[in-house]
Structures are given as structure tokens and as C-alpha cells.
Amino acid sequence: MRHVLPYIYNKVGHAVDCNRDKMFRKLFLVSLFAFVALAPAFAQKKEISQAKSAIKAGKAVEAEASMRKLLADSAHRQNEKIWLVLFDAVKKQYEDVNEKMYLKQSTDTAKLFDAAYRMFGVLEALDSVDAMPDKDGRIKLKYRRKHADYLDAYRKNLYTGGSYFLNKQDYPRAFKLFAAYIDCASQPLFESQQYASRDKRLPSAAFYALYS
């Protein structure tokens, strides 16, 4: 009996050690899978934070490039925060050029109109994300009215920019801005503005777009 008991204890101890090893392996694998799954989210959050800091530091161009790089991955395109930071980056570029023009400092006027064009593109894209139904099939628009009212004040820059590039004989850019001006009339984002019935410049914008 004295010889049997140590044998039993050894067997039990070995079984406990095996179970403990299996448990640790499972925990390790679970932790590893969790890390792999969450790593992209942490990296994305870090890039967004860095882009915000870049905008404040006067590096809006770099911030825009960073956010567009994120959006190149379709997995990120439903992240509203990326679109909002991207818009802030483009808006800051517009404001910087506009301020220089106001102060009569040397600047590239074309950059103002190009930034205005990109502002519309960003918020129109965000609107399509905003309009997606939730898991219950409901659509809750958080940004549409606010962004439509905001961009309405800048829309004239698309028309003015089209005319500017037309006079410069830069026809591709002229067409791009006139087309964006016209397209607002059919964008769900601007439904409340009723451009199709209220905007008397639409026919001339269409004419200049064809001319471009």
C-alpha cells in the first residue's frame, strides 16, 4: 500500500499539471486572438488622434493624407470619426488660404476652390454612411441638416471656382467644380435646400459645364 499511494499521487499530480498546461494554452490563444482582433482598432484610434494633433499643428495636408489612407480600406469607411477628422483637415486648408486672401498675402487661389470641392465630397460621403440603417433597420440621421446648412454657405465657391478655372482655360477643373455644383441638387444631403427648384444658377452652371 505504501508503494501504491505515491504512484497514485504522481498520477494525480501529473493530470493536474496537464490540465493546468491546457488551461494556460487556451488562455494564451484567447489572449492572442483578442490582441489580433483589437490591434487594428487601436492603430486606427491612434492615427485619428495623431491626425487631430497634426491639424492643430498646422499640418492639415498630412492629416488629410492620413485619413484618406485609412479610408482606402473598405473596413474603415463606416467609421464616422475618420470622415469628420478628414473634413476638419480639408476645412483647415480652406480656411488657411481664405485667411491669406483676406490679409492680401500671396497664396494660390486655386487651392481655395480645390479645398471647397473636397469639403463637399467628404460630407456627401459621410452622409451616405449616416443614412445607413442600424441593426433594426432604422435610419437616424445625425449630421444631414447641420452639414447641409454648413455647406450651403460654401456652395457658391463651386460655381465661382468653375468660372475661375474656365477663365484660366483649365477645363477639366472647371468642369469638375461646375459638375459638383450641379450635383448638389440631386444629393440627398441637400434635400432640404431644394436647389432643383430654387437655384436659378443651375442652367448657367450646366451650360458652362458643357462648355468646359
Give, region by region, the residue ranges found by the protein language model.
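Sec/Tat signal peptide C-region and signal peptidase I cleavage site
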Residues: 38-43
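Residue-level detector of intrinsically disordered/flexible regions characterized by low predicted structural confidence
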Residues: 10-13, 21, 28, 47
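Targeting/processing segments of secretory and organellar proteins
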Residues: 3-6, 12-15
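Sec-dependent N-terminal signal peptides
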Residues: 26-36
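Post-signal peptide N-terminal segment of secreted/secretory-pathway proteins
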Residues: 56-173
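Alpha-solenoid helical-repeat scaffolds
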Residues: 152-212
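Positively charged n-region of N-terminal signal peptides that target proteins for export
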Residues: 2-4, 20-27
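Leu/Val/Ala/Ile-rich N-terminal alpha-helices, chiefly Sec-type signal peptides and the beginnings
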Residues: 47-50, 54-56
